[in-house]
Curated annotation (Swiss-Prot):
A GO term for molecular function: ATP binding
Family per record: Belongs to the V-ATPase C subunit family.
Subcellular location(s) per record: Vacuole membrane
N-acetylalanine: residues carrying this PTM: A2
GO cellular component, one term: fungal-type vacuole membrane
Location, primary (coarse class): membrane
Gene symbol of the encoding locus: VMA5
SUPFAM superfamilies from the UniProt entry: Vacuolar ATP synthase subunit C
Record function comment: Subunit of the V1 complex of vacuolar(H+)-ATPase (V-ATPase), a multisubunit enzyme composed of a peripheral complex (V1) that hydrolyzes ATP and a membrane integral complex (V0) that translocates protons. V-ATPase is responsible for acidifying and maintaining the pH of intracellular compartments. Subunit C is necessary for the assembly of the catalytic sector of the enzyme and is likely to have a specific function in its catalytic activity. Reversibly leaves the enzyme after glucose depletion, causing the catalytic subcomplex V1 to detach from the V0 section.
Protein name: V-type proton ATPase subunit C
Name of one Pfam family that matches: V-ATPase_C
Note: Present with 21114 molecules/cell in log phase SD medium.
Length: 392
């Protein structure tokens, strides 16, 4: 069913000998069984086309099998990290594979129409060389994304620190973006300006008493510079020699003197620091999103080329030569994975020999010790045929 292709979270990549027939449906053609009988025809099944690769010795294949398993997991983890980063940036939904196209098509369509990229991964190379090429490229992409992500997080932290200076009430926040030169007495030998954050409930008290908080306060010099929900910010002009006396008395009356020496250079510097932090954060965010989305596509493509190699190597180890196999990718509707896998094992379990023959109750017997001679070398959890579950 085509709908399964777009609703599936799970895919099964399966390889069978070319002439294998389902024992649960004698006389049925294998392709017809996949499309019409498997879980009632609700799965979407398509051929997964893999070219023939240069095959070395049996020992070489076993080593490559182990390496492919490791690289498969590493690249899968890289994809998970990229999706996590994009989700953190609100650049993709939870179902990332539905929102990030591969080669301009949704992931399910890419899997349905998978083709080996012969220009990039040339077939005259050995399997070992192909593994190295794909692995190295994926590792470099992963490293690039992680490095850019670290730089972005650093810029984000710096911006948050700059933003904190602009937040909070007038008793604690930075004042560099609030005050103006005309709020201060500048370049005077004797006079200076003090800023005071006054709780709104004490505004009237301050206006009545500020001239008496110390000697040499300029009469009627207090004016409101700014106010918020909690405080009113006043400036007061007085003699420099009386600043300490004034601020001490102000604190005793629950007024809050703000330590602030007006400097156009400092104010300009602080504004530039904030603007620079904001600009860098935004620039790195754009760079990270672009890089992560590009890397996602490339790493995902690499991932399925590794899976193609893995299926091929495992199939040769299981079924031997010539390398003619029936390889399918199955889009499994939600909540049908266990049933689909069970029906596949019922139909093709005989390929595993006695280990997967049915017992007297008709159930697959996995306890037999006579597993395929390479089972312990090929897969941790042995299946009667080549099968990989892919969770997206």
């Amino acid at each position: 069913m085509a709908t399964a292709l777009y609703t599936a979270n799970d895919f099964i990549l399966i390889s069978l000998p070319q002439n294998a027939q389902p024992v649960t449906a004698p006389g049925s053609k294998t392709d017809s069984w996949f499309n019409e009988t498997l879980i009632g025809g609700r799965a979407f099944v398509s051929d997964f086309k893999i070219p023939e690769f240069k095959i070395g010795s049996l020992d070489t294949l076993i080593v490559e099998s182990e390496e492919l398993s490791k690289v498969d997991n590493q690249i899968g983890a890289s994809i998970g990290k990229i999706i996590e980063i994009l989700q953190g940036l609100n650049e993709t939904s939870t179902n990332a594979y539905r929102t990030l196209p591969i080669n301009n098509m949704p992931v399910p369509e890419y899997l349905e129409n998978f083709q080996w990229q012969t220009r990039k991964f040339k077939l005259d190379k050995s399997i070992k060389d192909l593994i190295t090429l794909i692995s190295n490229e994926s590792s470099q992409l992963d490293a690039d994304v992680r490095a850019t992500y670290a730089n972005y997080n650093s810029a984000k932290t710096n911006l948050a620190a700059a933003e904190r200076k602009k937040t909070g009430d007038l008793s604690v926040r930075s004042l560099h973006d609030i005050v103006k030169p005309e709020d201060f007495v500048l370049n005077s030998e004797h006079l200076t300006t003090v800023l005071v954050a006054v709780p709104k409930s004490l505004k009237s008290d301050f206006e009545k008493s500020y001239e008496t908080l110390s000697k040499n306060v300029v009469p009627a010099s207090a004016s409101v510079i700014a106010e918020d929900a909690e405080y009113v910010l006043f400036n007061v002009h007085l003699f420099k020699k009386n600043v300490q006396e004034f601020t001490t008395a102000a604190r005793e009356k629950k007024f809050i003197p703000r330590e602030f020496n007006y400097s156009e250079e400092l104010i300009d510097q602080l504004k530039k620091e904030h603007d620079s932090a904001a600009s860098l954060e935004q620039s790195l965010r754009v760079q990270l999103v672009r890089l992560a989305k590009t890397a996602y596509v490339d790493v995902f493509i690499n991932w399925f080329h590794i899976k193609a190699l893995r299926v091929y190597v495992e199939s040769v180890l299981r079924y031997g030569l010539p390398p003619h196999f029936n390889i399918k990718i199955i889009a499994v509707p939600p909540k049908n994975l266990s049933k689909c896998k069970s029906e596949l094992i019922d139909a093709f379990g005989f390929l595993g020999g006695n280990a997967f023959m049915k017992d007297k109750k008709g159930k697959i017997n996995k306890q037999d010790t006579s597993l395929h001679q390479y089972a312990s070398l090929v897969d941790t959890e042995y299946e009667p045929f080549v099968m990989y579950i892919i969770n997206l």
